[in-house]
């Protein structure tokens, strides 16, 4: 276990050394860039060279990142005796410089302070708005009171007879309005109750119909009824079924047992038509009709 911890610490030390080397290289590059511009004491070129300023800012950002990494590694190795690195610009490689690097923790604290200040400002603004609203409400109340006082003064100026007469009329009109409003409310309530009752009844009927339609049917399903029995010309034998006779699908009456081929069916229908025509032409009294109006014949 001790051997493993030693290897880990060695690895962390190597990574810290690499970070320090990278930081020193960046500082040397910045120093060389500045020496190129300030070698002859030409300070105006530095102000004009925006690209150089951007390059230096990017390298300073990278140095800040390396500082934060170094802090994290040192705290991880020695959480109790963690050493925060000093500003890299205070090294002998970069003397006489006023540039300072702000630690990330300080930057975070500054952000928190800014947020708190913003919240306080918002709260103050809300309080001011509430105060303004309260003032407006008070002003409105005062105006209403003044209007009421003016109305009362105008009524007191009238004669006592007129005042009494007007007060009676106002009382009667208010009673009539109250009665009318009460009647309207009662009518509206009755109409609403009637509508609700009608809707409930309709819903009940619909529910009953749905229940009937969904109710499972017992026994065999009923066969479709034919138009009429070809023997009697009525619905006295309504239960027909299909059956194959002599290799042909024919209609068979379950009641009388009559089965008809296609040709026989046509012949019977023609006979029925002719018999009905003959009866009508002979002006005979026709008394035997079934529910569908077909003539009963022998």
From Swiss-Prot:
Residues 203-212 have a biased composition (Basic and acidic residues). SMART domains: ZnF_GATA. The keyword Phosphoprotein does not apply. This is Putative GATA zinc finger domain-containing protein 25. GO terms for molecular function: sequence-specific DNA binding; zinc ion binding. GO terms for biological process: regulation of DNA-templated transcription. A zinc finger (GATA-type) spans 229-256. Residues 214-223 have a biased composition (Basic residues).
């Amino acid at each position: 276990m001790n051997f493993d911890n030693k290897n880990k610490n060695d690895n962390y030390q190597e990574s810290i050394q690499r970070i320090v080397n990278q930081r020193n290289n960046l500082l040397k590059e910045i120093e060389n860039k500045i020496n190129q511009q300030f070698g002859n004491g030409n300070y105006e070129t530095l102000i004009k060279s925006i690209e150089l300023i951007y390059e230096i800012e990017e390298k300073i950002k990278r140095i800040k990142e390396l500082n934060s990494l170094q802090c994290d590694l040192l705290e991880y190795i020695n959480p109790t005796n963690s050493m925060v690195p000093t500003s890299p610009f205070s090294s002998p490689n970069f003397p006489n410089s006023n540039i300072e690097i702000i630690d990330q923790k300080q930057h975070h604290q500054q952000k928190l302070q800014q947020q708190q200040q913003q919240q306080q400002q918002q709260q103050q603004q809300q309080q001011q708005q509430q105060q303004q609203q309260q003032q407006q409400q008070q002003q409105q109340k005062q105006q209403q009171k003044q209007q009421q006082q003016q109305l009362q003064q105008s009524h007191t100026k009238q004669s006592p007879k007129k005042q009494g007469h007007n007060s009676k009329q106002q009382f009667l009109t208010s009673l009539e309005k109250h009665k009318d409003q009460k009647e309207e409310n009662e009518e509206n309530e009755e109409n609403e109750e009637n509508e609700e009752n009608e809707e409930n009844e309709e819903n009940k009927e619909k529910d009953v119909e749905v229940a009937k339609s969904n109710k499972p049917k017992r026994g065999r399903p009923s066969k479709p009824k034919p138009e009429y029995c070809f023997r009697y010309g009525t619905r006295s034998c309504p239960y027909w079924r299909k059956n194959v006779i002599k290799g042909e699908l024919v209609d068979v009456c379950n009641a009388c047992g009559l089965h008809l081929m296609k040709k026989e069916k046509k012949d019977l229908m023609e006979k029925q038509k002719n018999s009905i025509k003959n009866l009508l032409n002979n002006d005979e009294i026709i008394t035997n009709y079934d529910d569908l109006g077909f003539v009963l014949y022998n």
